[in-house]
């Protein structure tokens, strides 16, 4: 499938899901929409996020719970694999994502958001070929600017330069 850069990527999942939180979650959904990849996932009841209700442009389903861990586990359960993008040590919901992947024995790849890691992510994607890819990581308030960095990283990841 051609993308914004006019290149053919090594592997693109059919669908990208996330929980809709600020930061990495929304960067994943924004990149998916820019690349014309189906997107979705689960979010807390009331479309809860740290900046208020998650905008309706994101095609997310609400869980019955307002608790973030419920949507985190549901997105892991409904996906083929999880890509955990981070900067520094895993903590909070990002660490929970890793632990829930371990608990459910679901494949995941945790990687720092650095351009030199794009090839490693592409290689993992080609190996796993996840039809539905869950993408998770820190919220914007715990890593200011991560939305922008993550979106650029994902746009580069799904292209061959």
State where each predicted segment sits:
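Acidic/glycine-enriched connector segments
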Residues: 4-132, 139, 146-158
């Amino acid at each position: 499938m051609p993308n914004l850069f006019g290149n053919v990527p090594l592997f693109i999942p059919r669908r990208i899901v996330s929980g809709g939180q600020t930061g990495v979650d929304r960067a994943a959904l924004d990149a998916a929409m820019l690349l014309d990849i189906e997107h979705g996932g689960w979010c807390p009841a009331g479309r809860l996020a740290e900046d208020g209700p998650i905008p309706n442009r994101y095609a997310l389903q609400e869980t019955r719970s307002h608790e973030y861990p419920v949507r985190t586990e549901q997105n892991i359960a409904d996906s083929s694999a999880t890509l955990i993008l981070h900067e520094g040590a895993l903590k909070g919901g990002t660490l929970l994502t890793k632990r829930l992947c371990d608990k459910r024995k679901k494949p995941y790849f945790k990687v720092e958001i650095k351009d030199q890691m794009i090839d490693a992510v592409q290689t993992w994607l080609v190996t796993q070929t996840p039809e539905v890819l869950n993408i998770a990581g820190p919220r914007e308030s715990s890593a200011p600017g991560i939305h922008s960095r993550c979106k650029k990283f994902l746009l580069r990841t799904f292209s061959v330069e």
